[in-house]
Amino acid sequence: MNNKIIEALIYIQGEEGLSSEQLQKVLKSESISSARALLKVFKEKWNNEQHGIKVEEFNDVYKFATIKDVKDYVSELVTIIKKQRLSNAAIEVAGIVAYKQPISKSQINKIRGVASEIVVNTLLIKGIIEEVGIAQTPGNPILYGVTAKFYDYFKIKSLHELPNLKEFDDTGEYESIEDFDLYSSQREDQDE
């Protein structure tokens, strides 16, 4: 049972990895050394089996990493993913960030009327938006802005090239968007 728990915890921790101290707290083990021993046994057992990923240890932090044999396939998938277009929701959030930056996730959620955390994380991973600061408001939320990749993706040189959009009011509603078509920049290059 411990191996299943360790596998799940390493998976959930992703790039951060799982430390002996964290495992000790989760399993309520008597000592960090006993948790470390469990991790070492898990690593050895896992790496002796046939998997596309291996367990690596970096300064007492255990992480999953791909094996060298599948490197080319992983690289190909990453290339395919990078070429994929943004979803309509991602385009919408990128537009909101461009118009309202710096802006917090909660402000984006308020404007859209739906939770946007996954979309914001996708845009962060793709490098379209980035963290630009921390608001000096309760909770100190992270503020987001667009990156140079935003300009490349939407084929614009500055935010002044975006269509005029009347300001959003405090409820997140906006008055008029007659000449606003956030999706047009993507539609234009579909015929190319």
Swiss-Prot record:
Its main location: cytoplasm. Pfam families: SMC_ScpB. The keyword Cell cycle applies. Keywords: Cell cycle, Cell division, Chromosome partition, Cytoplasm. PANTHER family: SEGREGATION AND CONDENSATION PROTEIN B. Belongs to the ScpB family. This is Segregation and condensation protein B. The lineage of its organism: Bacteria, Bacillati, Mycoplasmatota, Mycoplasmoidales, Metamycoplasmataceae.
